[in-house]
């Protein structure tokens, strides 16, 4: 295919990309011989050593038999051998490009099948489902609106019928009552007419006259009662009519409010229906766009499948090579597991031996401290940075001394030679000083550590104080006091819970930090205490304090077991430091406080 990513193979070209000029028949024979020699399985072995995310690393190893075969084939001509090697490099390059193109096409096809098609299908299904749900909701709302309208009409008709029934019922009752009264009046009138006619025909009789008067009086009384009953009936009818009018007004108000609410709900539903119709139109347009995109993706997928099929055919021989190299890789991994097992065994042995060495080193440090205590001389440690020392000085670790090669050869022996750490946390210095401190802390004997340096020593003092507080804070009641070298100012009882205060106190170079350890932790326990003096001086200050007696330093030296730590690096005057260390070794003797 013209658009394939598989590079073409090329053979028989000079370094300047110029094809050699020889006859076509001869050229084909030479190419056949060279290709047979390159592709023969006995000439080259492809070993895949590692497989990682960046690809497959390959290396080719030529057998000695291949070189011998080349010599026999071409008669040992170096030009032909060089040309064969060039062709072999091009074949390797073509194989690498084929592998890269195959991996890219596989990644693209996997990405299309695994990500884009499912996402588009899910999106289309979701939009179709949403359209159906919206249509169902619109139909339901329309049905509900029709039901509400029917209910309103039915209630309106029921109210009108009930009011008409009530009026008709009361009208019938009034008419019946009037009919009864008229019937009674007509009967009474007829009777009285008969009687009157009889009376007129007869002579007047006093008894009848009296009876007529009495009846007339009763008739007037009955008329009066009838008038009263008619008035009462009219009043009750008016009151009942007013009550019915009030109830009817309340009923109309309630129904009117319901109608207003229904009108508002209908208006809101109309807006919702309009919005849903607009959304439905937009969704139709989106569905149309998605269908176009889907058709485009189908075309692209078809093209990718065609390319993928062609690449699968090209990958078949490479898969065979990959299977053979995978077997070789499996064998290498098994050998790697065996080597890792042996390495773990050696690691365990190393850890055990390291523990023994550390224990022996700790015992040797305690013995060295005891020997130094017996000798009675002051202890001098060298805290050296060999990378920053001048060339004329070097460290002899066996004899624990620093040697000067320029001029007169000078050797200064120290009790310890401690190498300064790269990260400068000064814990190695503390580990070297702890045997000296433990010996006197266990016996509650005052001791001191003085750092001799021209440079700032606050980090060293801070590390010593912090490590001492962490190690002995649970078994002793501890207080930190500040004593200036002139003896004029003294700060006492500084809190140890705040690391900021310890850092601020250790920044002062012109004072001694006094850490007091007291065994009295409870009220009933006895109090036994000792002091640990931690300070720093330059070589000039230390010489001056030693010469000017009495002084604060001379008082500390006579009352404590002291240890001097000399910093040895490019920023120090190493000659003066070595001379001062020798002077301290010769002149100062430890007090016998044990």
From Swiss-Prot:
Localization: Nucleus; Cytoplasm, Cytoskeleton, Microtubule organizing center, Spindle pole body; Cytoplasm, Cytoskeleton, Spindle; Cytoplasm, Cytoskeleton
InterPro entries in alphabetical order: Vik1/Cik1_MT-bd (IPR031852)
Main location group: nucleus
UniProt superkingdom: Eukaryota
Described purpose of this protein according to its UniProt entry: Together with the minus end-directed microtubule motor KAR3, involved in spindle midzone assembly, karyogamy (nuclear fusion) during mating, and with an essential function in meiosis I. To contribute to spindle midzone assembly during mitotic metaphase, the KAR3-CIK1 motor cross-links anti-parallel microtubules to align them on the spindle axis; as the motor travels polewards splayed microtubules are pulled into alignment.
Misc. comment: Present with 98 molecules/cell in log phase SD medium.
Subunit-level organization: Interacts with KAR3; the interaction is direct.
Name this protein carries in UniProt: Spindle pole body-associated protein CIK1
Organism: Saccharomyces cerevisiae (strain ATCC 204508 / S288c) (Baker's yeast)
């Amino acid at each position: 295919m013209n658009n394939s990513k598989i590079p073409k193979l090329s053979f028989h070209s000079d370094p300047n990309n110029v094809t050699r000029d020889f006859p076509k028949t001869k050229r084909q024979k030479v190419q056949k011989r060279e290709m047979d020699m390159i592709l023969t399985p006995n000439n080259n072995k492809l070993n895949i050593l590692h497989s990682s995310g960046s690809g497959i690393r390959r290396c080719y190893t030529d057998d000695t038999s291949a070189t011998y075969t080349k010599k026999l084939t071409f008669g040992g001509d170096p030009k032909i051998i060089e040309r064969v090697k060039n062709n072999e490099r091009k074949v390797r390059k073509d194989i690498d490009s084929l592998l890269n193109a195959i991996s890219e096409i596989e990644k693209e096809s996997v990405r299309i099948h695994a990500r884009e098609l499912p996402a588009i299908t899910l999106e289309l299904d979701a939009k179709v489902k949403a359209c159906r749900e919206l249509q169902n909701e619109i139909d339901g709302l329309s049905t509900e609106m029709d039901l509400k309208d029917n209910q309103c009409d039915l209630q309106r008709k029921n109210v009108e019928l009930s009011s008409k029934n009530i009026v008709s019922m009361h009208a019938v009752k009034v008419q019946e009552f009037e009919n009864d009264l008229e019937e009674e009046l007509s009967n009474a009138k007829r009777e009285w007419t008969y009687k009157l006619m009889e009376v007129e025909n007869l002579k007047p009789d006093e008894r009848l006259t009296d009876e007529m008067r009495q009846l007339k009086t009763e008739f007037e009384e009955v008329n009066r009662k009838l008038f009263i009953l008619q008035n009462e009936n009219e009043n009750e009818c008016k009151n009942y009519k007013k009550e019915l009018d009030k109830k009817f007004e309340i009923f109309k108000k309630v129904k009117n409010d319901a109608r207003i609410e229904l009108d508002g709900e209908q208006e809101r539903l109309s807006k919702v229906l309009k919005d849903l119709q607009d959304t439905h139109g937009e969704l139709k347009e989106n569905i149309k766009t998605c269908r176009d995109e889907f058709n485009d993706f189908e075309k692209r997928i078809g093209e990718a499948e065609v390319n993928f099929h062609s690449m699968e055919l090209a990958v078949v021989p490479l898969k065979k090579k990959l299977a053979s190299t995978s077997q070789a890789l499996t064998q290498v991994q098994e050998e790697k597991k065996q080597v890792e097992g042996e390495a773990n065994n050696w690691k365990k042995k190393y850890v055990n031996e390291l523990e023994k060495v550390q224990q022996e080193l700790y015992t040797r440090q305690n013995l060295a401290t005891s020997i130094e205590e017996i000798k009675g001389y002051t202890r001098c440690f060298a805290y050296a940075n060999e990378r920053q020392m001048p060339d004329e000085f070097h460290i002899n670790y066996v004899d624990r001394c620093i040697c000067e090669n320029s001029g007169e050869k000078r050797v200064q022996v120290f009790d310890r030679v401690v190498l300064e750490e790269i990260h400068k946390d000064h814990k190695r210095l503390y580990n070297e000083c702890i045997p000296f401190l433990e010996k006197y802390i266990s016996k509650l004997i005052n001791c001191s550590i003085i750092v001799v340096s021209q440079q700032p020593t606050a980090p060293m003092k801070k590390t010593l104080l912090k490590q001492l507080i962490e190690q002995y804070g649970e078994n002793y009641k501890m207080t930190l006091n500040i004593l200036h070298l002139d003896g004029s100012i003294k700060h006492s009882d500084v809190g140890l819970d705040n690391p900021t205060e310890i850092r601020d106190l250790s920044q002062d170079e012109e004072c001694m930090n006094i850490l007091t350890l007291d065994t009295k932790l409870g009220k009933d326990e006895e109090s036994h205490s000792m002091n640990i003096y931690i300070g720093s001086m330059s070589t000039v200050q230390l010489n001056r304090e030693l010469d000017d007696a009495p002084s604060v330093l001379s008082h500390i030296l006579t009352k404590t077991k002291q240890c001097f730590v000399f910093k040895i690096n490019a920023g120090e005057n190493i000659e003066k430091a070595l001379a001062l260390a020798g002077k301290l070794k010769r002149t100062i003797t430890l007090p016998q406080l044990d």
